[in-house]
Amino acid sequence: LVQSVFDSVYDKYDLMNDFMSLGIHRIWKKNLINMMNPSIKSNLIDVACGTGDIGKLFLDNTRKNLSITCVDPNKGMISKGKEKLNNYKNIDWKVATAEKLPVQDNTFDFYTISFGLRNTKNINKALTEAYRVLKPGGRFLCLEFSKIQNSNLDFVYKNYSKLIPLIANFV
């Protein structure tokens, strides 16, 4: 079900994210990148990469010719990402799931997953894969929604969440 939703929205995914989050997702992603502080030899795997926002921010903010791998289970997302970031030659795009990454053990300094962990079929397996592909001392960074503790905000969030499918159809 989740993949069929992404199959239908990949060409408008970026616009949809901006619209649904009022652009706030960009601030969260920028903060994620700022937390990394990569070295000259750092590399990154971005899982559930969508159209490559995290990879682009990583390369733009490091201003280094670092190697990154962008992984998403949706071929349309990967295609849109390649099109959007065609000037970035050091991105290796892969169609795969978080539960079965087609990369060697102990490869990456950073593993990111943004708003994708909740969409995996098996969170424990996805986390095991993250651990497998990270180098010893590598960093796992995850952006994800969580339960709201404030009952007033929870009411707003739950009702807004019901609108998201309608918004997706509109966009």
Each language-model region and where it sits:
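A short acidic, Gly/Pro-enriched loop at the edge of an enzyme's catalytic core
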Residues: E99-Y111
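Conserved alpha-helix/loop element of class I SAM-dependent methyltransferases that forms part
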Residues: L22-S42, L57
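Conserved class I S-adenosyl-L-methionine
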Residues: R139-A168
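A short glycine-rich, Lys/Arg-flanked "PGG" loop and its adjoining helix->strand segment in the class I
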Residues: N124-P136
